[in-house]
Amino acid sequence: AAAAPANGVSVAETRTWLAGLGGAVGEPTVRDGLTTLHVADQPLPWNLTFYACGPSLCDDVQFSAIFTGAITAEQVSSWNREHRFLKAFYTPAATPGGEATAVVQYDVVLTGTGAAQQLNEPTVIWLQLLRAFAERLVAAAPAAAAPAQ
């Protein structure tokens, strides 16, 4: 069995820290052995999933968000060519006329011990890149039709 991480953050402390910054942080959810915090920031909600967890600390986290709409594979490929840290994954619409999906992810390996404040810089980077990705999608969206007179 792998040794428990000596570095990282606890889920509870991270939730408290994010809420203290003004994030609308939900209760932790566990799915397939992974714990996730949903942050209902508007207009861009996102998730923080904890990996490589021991009894108290997790030393690997992933920020992620899901976008749906008139998204193209070319938009996602273009983003990935131009941006090193925030990676996007494209899923075409399941049905003709349906909405495509893009998932963006930012992985962070933590080398500090215990304090959620070690997430300061990664969180700032995440929020900047998340906003930039959303702005890129909006800028590429087809122009809205002029309102009927």
Model-assigned labels for residue ranges:
Residues 137-149:
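Short, highly charged C-terminal tails/helix-capping segments
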Residues 17-24, 79-82, 129-136, 140:
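Structured segments of extracytoplasmic/periplasmic soluble domains
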Residues 25, 48, 88-90:
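A structural signal for short hydrophobic beta-strand segments in well-ordered beta-sheet cores
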Residues 41-68:
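Long, continuous compositionally biased terminal/linker segments
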Residues 86-134:
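A short, solvent-exposed beta-edge/loop patch
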Residues 5-12, 70, 113-120, 124:
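Soluble non-cytosolic domains of exported or imported proteins
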